[in-house]
Amino acid sequence: MAERLGAWALGFVFAPSKRRVEPDQAAAIARRLGPFAARVGVFVDSEPEEVLRVARRAGLTALQLHGSEPPEWAAALRRHLPVIKAFRLSGPADPAWLEYPADAILVDGATPGSGKPYQPEWLGPLWSHPRLIVAGGLTAERLGELYAYGCPYAVDVSSGVESSPGRKDAQKLKAFLQASARGCG
């Protein structure tokens, strides 16, 4: 459904979460996607060997590191797949995050998946990153406020398009993707 509505990346959570999927479930979904939809695995503090094992089994094309992974892990994983490093924002962003060895950085709320937004101005110096992905409390209605501050490379949504935890709502997803497509313009 998400790809048909215009999403160009789909996330598969492999960390303990109400949205967690097994590698075989992700692989079954990934096989139904078109060739240009990114298949992103979300991991929290998993050893690089385990991440790569799951990535192969699930057919992933990118990795999102959402824990306290040391830079060395990201550097090792980048030899195999693109890496997105997620940081949790509970106040103004740390400019040092720009130095983390990742292909993109993602900024999420203090409690990922909670739907609780943060202040867009907290992103401050991160707007200079060419591949800034913004997440955290996003909804179709909130995208306009975000775009007033800057134009991220991408936006990432989960709870903002759900009818209940882990259940995507087609109407909310469609509205979000339409608002996202209008962009910063």
Model-based region annotation:
Residues 1-185:
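Conserved N-terminal beta1-alpha1 strand-loop-helix module at the mouth
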